[in-house]
Structure formats: C-alpha cells, structure tokens
Amino acid sequence: MSGSLNSRWVVQVSLTIINIIGFLVFLRGFFPSKVVLPGFNSFQDSTKSPFSDQYGNPQFNKFILMVVDAMRSDFCFSDRSNFSFLHQLINQGRALPFTAFSNPPTVTLPRLKGITTGGTPNFLDAILNVADDQDDSQGLHNQDSWVHQFRHSNNKTINFFGDDTWLKLFQDQFTEFEGTNSFFVSDFTEVDNNVTRHLDDQLSSNKWDGLILHYLGLDHIGHKGGPESPYMKPKQIEMDKILQRLYTYVTKNDDTLIVLMGDHGMNEIGNHGGSSPGETSAALSFISPKFNHKGESPLPYNSDYSYHHKISQIDLVPTLAALLNFPIPKNSLGVIAKEILEIWPENQRIKILLENCAQIMNLYEAKYGPSGKVWSQWENLQAKQHPIADYYEFLQDIQSEMASSATNYGYKDIYAGALILVITALAVIVVFNRYFLTASNMNISSVMFYELFVVLYSLHFHGSSLIEEEHQIWYFFTTATLLFLAITFFDTFKSLQNFISFGVLFACIRFMRSWNNSGQKYSSQYNIAYYLSHSNPNLMWGLIILTYFVLTLCIYIQGSLVPTFAFSFGKRLPDVKDPGGLISFIVVFVATSVSFSFKLLQYYIDGNTIPKWLNRFLLWIIESHHIDLSSATLEDNELKFQLQSVSIQLSKFTTIILLLLVISRVIIGKIRKIRYGTITDITNIMTIYLIHQTRHENIPIFLALMFAKFALSKLIYRKTNRIDQYILTVTMTVLCLQNLTFFCMGNTNSLATVDLSNAYNGVKAYNVFLVGLLTFVSNFAGPIFWSLSGLQLLYEPSLLNFNGPATTDLLHYTGLKKSILLVKSLISLFFYTVSAVNLVGSCINLRFHLFIWTVFSPKLLFFGSWILFVNVLIDLILAVIVLLF
C-alpha cells in the first residue's frame, strides 16, 4: 500500500464528491421543470360560451369534488365494493361511472396537477411530493387550471378541506380551508374526521360555489395493510355514507354537481407510484339528479380494474369546464367525456367539441407550428361538419401524441453531467487498476473477475426488462461470485468444515431468494413472506421471537459488550454473578423485549389477528398502560388513538435505549481500553433497530442473513495474510449480498414498492427529515445490515465465529485501519462510477422510450439513493465513525 495515505484519501473523496455532483447535474437536466404556456385561457368566441344553454346558463352553477385518495376503480364498481349507495345511483342513472387512467408517477402531487391543469405529469413532482410543508415550489399560481378559471370567471368562491397538497398548489385560491398532512400514514381516522366535521356547517350555508374534500384515510390503510386490510371495508362504507350526505344536499340544490374520484389507485400491497394496472386505474363518477344514464353496478371483479367507460383522468378538466361553463385551461390535454356530452342538445355538441379541439390545437401550434398532417386535419374539421366520432378520434390522437412528447429535457445539464461522470469513471478506473495491478500483490484473476462483473452488471441498464427484473441479475451474480471464490479463495473443497459452511451460505441465499416476490413483471403468492403473513401467522411470530432470541444471544456472547460492562477485569465472559454482566444482559433483554412488544402492538393496531398464544402478552402490554379492552373494539376511535400513543412510546423507548447502549459501549470501552469487539457490538445492536424498522413478515429473513454471515466468516477466517485479496473478496461479496437482500425483502426499482408502513415508528407528527430517515432505514435495512457486517468481516471475523479476538484479525493492525477502509471504498467506488456512466448513457439513448418515466426514471432515483445514502452515508461516513471508536 504505497503512496501518501492522506493524499490518496483526498483524491478518492474528491472523486466520490465529483461523481455525485455529476449525477445531480444530470438529474437536473433530465428532470427539468415543465415548460407550460403562460397566461389564462378564454373562450374562442369571446361573445358567447359554447357550453351554456340557450339562455346563457351553465349546466351547473356549483360543484362538490370529493377526492378519496388511492380509490382504485374496483373499490367503487366491483362486486367486492362496499359503496352500496353509489351502486344505487349508477343503477338509477344518477351517476356516470368511469375508470380513469392516471398517468405515472401515481403519487398525489403530480396527479393533482394533472386533474386541475389537464397537463401530463412531470416526474420531478414525484420527488417534490414529499417536500416539506414550507416548500411552495410546486405552486400553480401562475399556471392555468380549472380552480383558477372557476374562481375568476364569475367571481366565485371555493372552500377546501383535506390533503394540504392542495394548499401548496393553490395558495390564496380558497376562501375557507383546513389542510391535513398526507404523510402520517398511521392515522386512518382523525385525518378523515377533520374533513367530515366541516360538512354540517358547509352544507347548511350558501357561502361557497365550489367545495373540495380530499380524504386520506383509505390511502393510509392501503400503505399499512394493503387493499385487503380489515379496515378497508369500514372505510369504504364511511366514504359511501358521506357521499349519501352530499347527494341528499344536491337533491335540494340540483344545480350542484358532485364529482367522486380517486387521485390514483394502489397495487396489491397497498402502495402506489408505479404504472401497474391497479395503480393507474382510479375511480371517477359524475353525480347529479339531472343525469339519466342508467348503468349496471356492481360489476364482476376483474384483475385489469377496467369497469364501465375508460377515460384519461385529465379528461376531467375539459369536462368540468363544459359542465360549469368556464374556458378550458390553457395547457390541458384532456378530452370532454363522451357520455357527459349527452346532457346537451345534439345541435350544440359539435360546437362544444370544436372548442375542445381549438384549445388543444393552440398547444399543438405552440409546439409544432401551424403545419403538417395534423394541422390539415384540423382545418378540415373546421371547414365542414363531421360525425361526432371523427372529432373524438382527432382529439384522442392529439392527446396521445402531445402527452408522449411533453418532456423538455435540459440538454446542457444532461451532457455536462454525463461528461463529469465519464471523466470521473475513467479516473477511478485508472486509480483502481494502478493500485491492484501494480502496487498490490494480488491474484490478477480476482481483479479481472471483479472488473468483468461490474461491466456486465452495468450493461443491464440498457434494457427496460432487465431493470424491472434486476433481482434475477443479482441472484445470478451472487451465485457466480461465490462459485468463483469457492475455487480461488475459500478453499471450499479442502476441508469438510469449509464445504459445509459453503453449503449453508448457499442454502441461506436460496432461502432469501424465495422469501418475497421481487421484480415488476410477475406477481405470485407462492413465496415465504406471503405464506407467513396470510396462512401461518403462528409460524411467523414463532420465527420473529426466534430472530430476536438469536440476536440477543449474539449481542451477549459474540462481541465484547459483557466484558466492557463487567466489574471484573480480564475475562471475556465474566462470572454470571458479576453485576456488570447482569446489567448488560438486562439492558439488552429490555431493548429486544420492548422492540418485540412494539412490533406485536403494531401488528394488532394494523387490524391483524394476534395468535392466541400471544393474546395474554398483548393484553399485558395494553393493560400496563392503563387501557381497558374489555368494553371496546378496535373500531373505537378513542381506543385506537390510545393504542397508537402506546405504540409511539414503545418505539421511542426502543430507539433511546439502543442509542444509549451504543454510546455507553463506546465510551466505557474507550475508558477501559477494550479495543476488540466494538464493530461487532455496534453491528449487533444496530441490527435490533433494523429489525424494529422491518415489516413483520420480513423479520425472520434476518435469521438467514445472520447464518449467511456466520458461514461467510468461517470461509474467510484466518485468510488475512493476503490483505488486498481479502479486502476485495469481502467487499465484492458484501456488494452482491447488499443488492440481493434489497430485492429479496420485496423491494424493486419502482416507486410503488417503497414501504411507508414503518416510516412513522415513534413519530407523533409529520417531520420530513425524520420520516425520510426512517423510510430509508426501513427500505434499505438489508443493505445497511451488510454494510455493517462488511466491517465485521474485514476487521473482526474471529468474533463472528464466537472464537474471541485473534491476532490474525485486521483490527489489531491499527496502522492499516485507514488503508483498509480506503481500499474497500475504492472497490465500491469503481462499481458505482462505472454503473453511473452506463445508467446515464442508457437514459440519454432511450430518452424517448415508451418506458422512460415508468422504468428508467425511477431507477435513476433508486440509484441516487444507493450512491448517496448507501455508498457515502453508510459505507463511508458511518464506517469512518465506527472505526474511530
């Protein structure tokens, strides 16, 4: 390890920072702010509206928009739906039902922009969707929308209650309003009650012309328990009863239109953000006693979620404009719903469609100019009257063409960012090869294998299906890497112990591979996690208890926690009567017990049935906090709030006690000069917290991870005499296991699989930084586990074998600590820089690809999380902090 260590660190850290800067510059160009036409629209004929009747009156003077977040089409229209009053209205012809296609990304902010402006979403909005409450960068105050048009066309008032995203978008547009935060997903009840409590006052007054209600509870239930949650049925019934209240008001005020809709749907696990049929199929109904279009409801359930007529969700915008008589917003790509057109007399329908055509052609002209085949078609439509079907065909063709080409890339930033990434990658390749091929005493075959592995992996970014099914690639590369190391480094076939250890490692990997559905193309219930959570919760909780038990033993036996706190000196495992050893055991036992209690209570609050043999323990947890269950049910809101409060306390206590345990271990270890075991103790204590932040059905996978780590430590034990070879082997293996575990825990490269169910553990109110951190930990628990385990395998492999500290452990080479971490970081940096170049290159090459927003763009965001949070924050910064102690 030649050369100045400090100068090498400066070079490597600089390359890491430059790589991140290049990636961020590229993202700024790839996700630019959307360019829209300025100003606000007016009717083509300024003297008369084409939407008003012969007396100049609109079809409706007032409206009530009821948005139920994540209301998938089947929740309203299928035979599994609990919207019985809505079904009655459809059968009577008073409701016109639609399945509305929601353009990805299917998260609230871009969808609200789409359904108010009629424009296609900007993928950047998926990131801004989690922006802080004080961030007003998403606002639409300078962009045309039906909210602006309705309010200003006839000096009308709109009141709003619900998701505060509306207040960020439309500042100063609402006369009366109250916002509720959309990200506190643990709350199913109060978040909706805060909307409904305004209804009596609003429906008894005439102080509004428009009333917008945005309910979040159904979405929160989906995030916590999925579409099959036991809370889903009562929530649908609650929403149906609210609709009934609104319709009762409308029967007495028949100039008021009700619009019931979902902003997007949800997938089979209750999340959204991607492009699956469940996520993009939202319910939409126009409701009024004026309608007389009899339908049939409910319809048989179908897995495509296609019910009644299918339209694009942005078609709501011109449809509302026509019904409420105001100009269609300037940037709308929506098409007036054909079924709604029947409310006007036949001689007026073509005028209405021509208004829609003229508005959308203004957009077309601004982009392409007044020429070409499309322009000729438009002139032909204006010249003479055509069948209504011709106008709709023309509008839908233009909508499709304009929506697919709505992106305005910032090419200067794209190419600048790509150039920075290429230069950085070339520099890292030179540094990597210069060190491993010249300055290091390495087996060249291992270096060449790693470089080939990185290049082959990074090439997969050029295929959309390979990105969607990346878990298959990592299963292959992990298997191939271990087989290569079995021959070149592990000495697998030279002893029975090594052969058994290798077999255990492979068995654990195969076990992990079967744990969850991974990937985006194929979904199946034939996996371990689904079996445990749906068919055998008794076994699941037995495995959860076993996981906590094994981890508690590892903390107590594996590292040096006990000797650190022991009153007697010099013994690795002091006498059982030693007060210090007893205290350390009690603290660890309390931490794991409280964490387990939290997970059990969380499972119960989410509406799941607790195994009978755990009922007494659950009852003890609840009654110890002075809550009486004898006369209450989980549907009781007051009880639910009390249980939620207990859950928050348990989670906070777990976090605090684990943090104090780590701090005490480090400080007392420093005072007593106990050098060995610090990394192992921190890793094991942190693993409790990772389990604490993991979904219930995924907790037992940590048993497989711990056994895999133990087997791997057996294979590399006492092989540290070839230090560089050892570092490359451990880093390469950990890199494979990090990524494989990420996918095996149910994650994919889709925003729809981002798990929010543990993002609010111990959190009483929404805090963007705290929730963001918890979201990262809960979704990247597997990679974080292997990051910390990698340090164990590098510096303290003997402790992993329960053998006590050995002189061969690299921890004892204090002068090499920084050098070892430097080499490890160089190996990781080589992987991330080469991968970044290929990913960025594929996005540039395929920027007009059909799946650019549904596959490649989410991958960019996930890759950004890997390089910034996993590689830099965990693998580098956290590693430096751990090694300092």
UniProtKB/Swiss-Prot annotation:
The keyword Transmembrane applies. Its EC number is 2.-.-.-. Glycans are attached at residues 82, 155, 194, 443, 516. The chain crosses the membrane at residues 413-433, 447-467, 473-493, 495-514, 539-559, 581-601, 648-668, 697-717, 726-746, 768-788, 820-840, 865-885. It is a multi-pass membrane protein. GO terms for molecular function: CP2 mannose-ethanolamine phosphotransferase activity. GO terms for cellular component: endoplasmic reticulum membrane; plasma membrane. Disruption phenotype: Cell-wall protein anchorage defects. Gene3D superfamilies: Alkaline Phosphatase, subunit A. Pathway: Glycolipid biosynthesis; glycosylphosphatidylinositol-anchor biosynthesis. PANTHER family: GPI ETHANOLAMINE PHOSPHATE TRANSFERASE 2, PHOSPHATIDYLINOSITOL GLYCAN-RELATED. Belongs to the PIGG/PIGN/PIGO family. PIGG subfamily. Ethanolamine phosphate transferase involved in glycosylphosphatidylinositol-anchor biosynthesis. Transfers ethanolamine phosphate to the GPI second mannose. This is GPI ethanolamine phosphate transferase 2. It comes from Candida albicans (strain SC5314 / ATCC MYA-2876) (Yeast). The gene is GPI7.
